[in-house]
Amino acid sequence: MKITRITGTFPSTSGLCRCRYYMYIPENPRAAVMLSHGMCEYFQRYCGFAEFLCRNGIALVGNDHIGHGNSVSDRDMLGYFGEAGGYMYMVKDLHRMRALSLIHI
């Protein structure tokens, strides 16, 4: 089965970084899942899971949250979401990720 892999970046609502995103899309997907990884994680840990889902007709999309994975250009920023209430940037970034994925799926 052919799997289309798309990567790119979008500006985080935090203004602190550009979030790296990933999309694994099978031919004629019957469903899509958006993954939101945990603390100290990053999307690429889930490549095997993405391929499993694609083999079963399900697309997987997600991004490295602010302060995580390839969304960090300075290692001192690992785990940093921003000032008080910074977690809301992550939530808003997930909404951006959803809108972006709808263009491709």
What are these regions (language model features)?
Residues 1-25:
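N-terminal cap/lid segment of alpha/beta-hydrolase-fold proteins
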Residues 30-33:
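Alpha/beta-hydrolase fold active-site loops
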Residues 103-105:
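Conserved small/polar residues in nucleotide/adenosyl-binding loops
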